[in-house]
């Protein structure tokens, strides 16, 4: 049986090998990278398509250093637009919270070895400190991006010709692996400092120094102060926020050139899935058919379940890979939910191994067809028995996305026939008549659940969330979006009393994700939030900050209700009303968040 299972990966492995043999990389946009493909530790950014405007540097002489803003993607070719140099920055944090600051250097002369050294944070007047193990420091590197569609209404649609879109280098990857960078004259470089305050930290003001150097020569020092409150955030595993970012294990196998589902593959995946866990990730993404989304990503989702039609016409299903994937993710710490895609794939085509002909075959069938009901009743009956044996049945969802109402109704009927207790999830359009059948319901930002539906689902313990995709121009998570829009997402969930947020792609990397985030379908960055080498990003970091805000808001709500502090509760709810997507981008997400934080004392 193992021979049959791994036969299905032959095509994948051949494509991995061909890429590994390339002498130099090439991006989705056809740009040569002039370096080995698929870099992990060190790499060179692509040339900047925007030339330096000397007039903008007239007032920026010498080497300049300052704290900047985490709301800004500083342009590589322009001096930082700061009205004054800021040498000290003050941040507020609860115990257990992550907070971050961005420093920035802009220089009219070359720097051969720019680096930053961050010391531990010491508590004023006491011996307590937050040591370096709680601090992430890295350069904010540059990646190629593009823009919204010409009509400004979103980022959906094929983009076969990159020249039709304005392409620039943009700050996004946070590179904690590169110890130093060489900067040419007339360039700007940001650096990130993130502190994860220990849950048992003593409240008070903690101070650290950031020394920025060019080789051995110190360019300057910046002071970071964190005001730690006595309140405490729970650990991410205990966050209420339901974060569902679809993981793509196949992208990691391709990028690292390892055999899918080998021990090495799991070792390469671990850092990325730990990052997802530490962001509060709750859901394991499983593909139970071949290409449930018709290969829309560069690295298509292959099936984790082997489908075999035996010579006698009966069906056999092998769950070896599915089990290994789920067990691995649970070992990492993702244990709340398993979503299995999809009974209604985009092509309505199902691949299986045919024992009689010793070949791979396809069945094309749709909900409502007799054949559809027969094959899925067989599969789901087998699957339910297997899940019950493993102890996973209660957390496993049969999942669909963006499917028509009639197809959903028929699919639900087939699921209930196979096992009436199966849980079902949908990420798609709002159909309130489906709500009772959906244990996990996620609709697009523009669609609004009625208060009645939200309240009923809350009472029944069902998950109710929302998503953004390529359709929303604002807010979104493209690499050219203002970083604060990623934080806005968590705040909005708090305003709407939703359980969380879904984004369809955590790590569906393009060919060279560290260098060029553009894709031949959709706006740049739509397919991934994190980078090779276990690198985080401005987008991912700000998303986590929004999730933390959600947790803090809900903790305060519970406290105010318990203590009957109606005035404080009303003030909080009034502040949350500012999170209205209709006001973006005229009022920026950054300004909105700043106003609300000031009102709430965050």
What does each model-identified segment do?
Residues 1-25:
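Bacterial Sec-dependent N-terminal signal peptides
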Residues 18-294, 392-393, 586-602:
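Mature N-terminal, pre-catalytic/accessory segment of carbohydrate-active enzymes
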Residues 95, 267-268, 317-321, 406-407, ...:
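Short, glycine/acidic-rich beta->alpha junctions
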Residues 165-166, 174-175, 187, 196, ...:
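Aromatic-lined carbohydrate-binding surfaces of glycoside hydrolases
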Residues 349-352, 360, 364-372, 376-430, ...:
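Catalytic domains of carbohydrate-active enzymes that cleave complex glycans
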Residues 422-448, 467:
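Aromatic- and acid-rich polysaccharide-binding/catalytic face
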Residues 458-488:
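Active-site clefts of carbohydrate-active enzymes
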Residues 482-528:
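Substrate-binding cleft of secreted/luminal carbohydrate-active enzymes
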